[in-house]
Structures are given as C-alpha cells and as structure tokens.
Design a protein with these regions (language model features):
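Extracellular glycan-modifying ectodomains
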Residues: 1-220
C-alpha cells in the first residue's frame, strides 16, 4: 500500500492548501503562417520576380562564395585580436518569406545559406540569429515591396536580435518619436523600369517610417 500524505491543518482545524507556485515562464511567441503565393502567380522582369505588387530578388550562393565571405570575417576577427568582439549578422531578404515556396528551398534557401555561413566562422565570432526574429514578424511591414531593403521596422527587429546576442538592452519602440512619408518607390522599380510589370509597383508605392529617439544623446 502507498503512503498517504496528510496536509497540515491551521488553528481552526481547516486543512491548508499549499500555495500555487508562481511561474515566470515567458509567453511563447506565435509564429505567423507564411502565405506563399503559387508559382503560377510569379512574373519575371529580368532577374526580378514580381508577385502581385511585390518585387523580389531570389539570391543564390555557392558554397565557395559563402566560404569566401566567412574566411574574410575570420581574417578580420584575427586581425582585430582577442580584445575586440567580432559580431556577424547575416540577414535574408524579402524573397525568403514572400516568394512562392519553391523559390526559397534547396539551393535558394537563405536560411540554409546563413546557417552554413555561420558554421564556417571561428568560434570566437558572435553570430546573430536575425532570421528567426524576422520570421516571427512576417505578418508586419518588415520588407518593402518596391525596394530590395528591409523597412525601418524590419531593421529594428534585427537590431533587437543583435542586442539579445550581444548582451545589450534594446531600446523599446515606444521610446521613439515616429512619423511617415508616403509614396516611396524604391530600387526594385528602377531595376524593372523597362518592363511593363513595373507599372504595378508604381501604382502601389511603399511608405517610409522614421524613428527619432526621444532621449537626447551626446557623443564626443
């Protein structure tokens, strides 16, 4: 037979219930589903892929190219010495998240490219996982549709990944004064200007957001 555990009684003879243990476990971040378009929706304007009103570059990189980059970072870290931290942040572009699924798999998987690149770097180099941070916010405005860059918001999320890796405290978004400029058309429109598909980009411009720090800083 098992031994029964008797709960203690208080002065009134009532059985005391042990208090619930407090948990400080952080809430898990919900990763949005990727709504990848069908390959039949893709149009080509030179080396640019246009799906709907979004233009994207689909990069490819051979192992030798990736190894060459990692070798350069390794050499830089060695030249700077042990007293200087070398930090590498390699990031995907919008094609990794918003292109048809077959365009970011296999040799076109930017996640695989980044992972391989980091694996070729010396152990002394601090590598930043900006990919996962961006992936968690793909339902937000983190990449332009008419430009090959990330938006200011996308850059902010990569900055928070950098801070987490480097041991810094990221400045929260609500600590900035924000504003917006409308009707921005970027580099992808310029790259496709000689193709009829570029009109779609011109008719559906992006917007620019800016973030000004509320706190005044001084540098010498």
């Amino acid at each position: 037979t098992g031994t029964e555990e008797t709960l203690p009684e208080n002065q009134n003879g009532d059985t005391q219930t042990p208090p619930e243990e407090a948990t400080d476990a952080p809430e898990e971040e919900t990763i949005p589903e990727l709504d990848n378009p069908d390959i039949s929706e893709a149009q080509y304007a030179g080396n640019v892929v246009i799906v709907g009103d979004r233009a994207m570059e689909i990069p490819t990189a051979t192992d030798s190219v990736i190894e060459s980059y990692a070798k350069t970072v390794n050499a830089l870290a060695s030249a700077l010495g042990k007293d200087v931290r070398t930090i590498s942040l390699v990031t995907p572009n919008g094609g990794e998240f918003y292109s048809p699924e077959s365009m970011h798999q296999g040799l076109n998987s930017q996640k695989d490219m980044i992972d391989y690149c980091y694996s070729q770097m010396n152990g002394s180099i601090l590598t930043v996982d900006a990919y996962s941070k961006l992936r968690a916010h793909t339902d937000e405005y983190i990449f332009f549709r008419t430009d090959h860059h990330w938006t200011q918001l996308g850059a902010y999320y990569a900055y928070t990944a950098f801070c987490e890796a480097a041991g810094f405290e990221a400045v929260p978004l609500d600590a900035f004064e924000t504003g917006r400029y409308d009707r921005f058309v970027g580099s992808m429109y310029n790259f496709t200007a000689n193709y009829p598909q570029s009109q779609t980009l011109l008719d559906n411009p992006d917007y620019l957001e800016y973030y000004l720090p509320i706190a005044t800083t001084h540098a010498k």
